[in-house]
Amino acid sequence: MKNVRIIGLGLMGTNLGLNLISKGIKVYGEDVSDYANNRASKLGIDINKTDEEIDLTILAMPVNKIISYLKENKKISNTKALLDIGGTKQEICDLMDQSEIPSIGGHPMCGLADNNSWEPTPEIYEKATFLLCETESTSEDSKTIISNFLKLLNAEEVWIERERHDEIISITSHIPHLISSALVGIAKDDYQINEIMGMAAGGFDGATRLTRTNPEMIIDMYDTNSKNINKFLKVFLKEISEIMDLQERKELIDYLSSSVEWRRALSEKFGERPLS
């Protein structure tokens, strides 16, 4: 792999470009924002147009913008393969099915909770799990290109069906974001900030750090995955209702112990992940 084009030079796109540059890859980039283009250019991403054939074009925009881009650009010039890194996959992959370019849906399991920070952090992609969804336009050559791309990142390649991806990601990412916001809602509506911060420690900080996420990303995930989010919010409310119905101390201990055992088993198998 010699060169990559990244469309969308926000936090994720720029950091991906910087990671690839550090591996000796020529990175071209473009964004609708002049500010983003200028920032990326100063960091070493080439924002000039090129007629050179591109090995891989990556769509690194918010989900709804990726969807709009795919609707308007069924054919993308001088590229061998197309990949997106959006947080939901069903709608994106449905559009990629119709693409004239061999296309694969992607979702790197990395990022920063505070995605309004512009400090370069290209290392977030290193050794990340990279979820991939095949589409009707996917070719064997495009799979090889993606595999080589992920080797550059030292990332783990995991293939998953688009429907299954969106179902699971609603539990592991989308619902936690909404619960985090709900907890902040309780705190800010009922208590003074000095009272909250004077008594807050790891529990509150850990449970609410996701509220630092750009609201546009949250709206995108809800717009494109509302069916799964609503389904599991109902499951979550049922779980809360069951906790409220526990009458005996032993019942609550048993409930909490079951959760502790499951979470510890998860940590033992996969290790603890650093908070970002």
Language-model-derived ranges and their functions:
Residues 63, 69-119:
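Rossmann-like NAD(P)(H) cofactor-binding subdomain of soluble oxidoreductases
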